Amino acid sequence: MAKSISKIGSRKNARIGSRKQTRKIPKGVIYVQASFNNTIVTVTDVRGRVISWSSAGSCGFKGTRRGTPFAAQTAAANAIRTVVDQGMQRAEVIIKGPGLGRDAALRAIRRSGILLRFIRDVTPMPHNGCRAPKKRRV
């Protein structure tokens, strides 16, 4: 029978002080995807790695309230709060989609104090492609 030798003070797989470093991100790209049902705001660095994201649904809005301008404003403020703390000063904004939250999200981004290099609208527009959904009758 083998005798076990206990080492005093030994730590296996110990990770002392290996917390992930919060790096400074001076500039980035803010993507706003505004559909009729929800608004998703994603903040990336220049290389495209996601730093922060938020959506109206993740901010606590459920159902039809997710598509409102106020929900989009809350989602944008939520996503940007973390990157402002990491030192983001300049950003490019890329907006996609026809939703109601486009302008509200852009207003929240402008209010955050980040300098905007440009605002680009990349909403896909069909050149008479697929048939559009029928109009609602309420």
From Swiss-Prot:
Start-end of Basic residues biased regions: 9-21
Protein origin, superkingdom: Eukaryota
Pfam families registered for this protein in UniProt: Ribosomal_S11
Any one cellular-component term (Gene Ontology): chloroplast
Region (Disordered): 1-21
Entry GO MF terms: rRNA binding; structural constituent of ribosome
Localization in the cell: Plastid, Chloroplast
GO biological process, one term: translation
Alphabetized UniProt keyword annotations: Chloroplast, Plastid, Ribonucleoprotein, Ribosomal protein, RNA-binding, rRNA-binding
Plastid keyword on record: yes
Homology family: Belongs to the universal ribosomal protein uS11 family.
Listed HAMAP family: Ribosomal_uS11
UniProt subunit comment: Part of the 30S ribosomal subunit.
PANTHER family in UniProt: 40S RIBOSOMAL PROTEIN S14/30S RIBOSOMAL PROTEIN S11 (PTHR11759)
Record's protein name: Small ribosomal subunit protein uS11c
Organism listed in the record: Cicer arietinum
Gene name, Swiss-Prot/TrEMBL: rps11
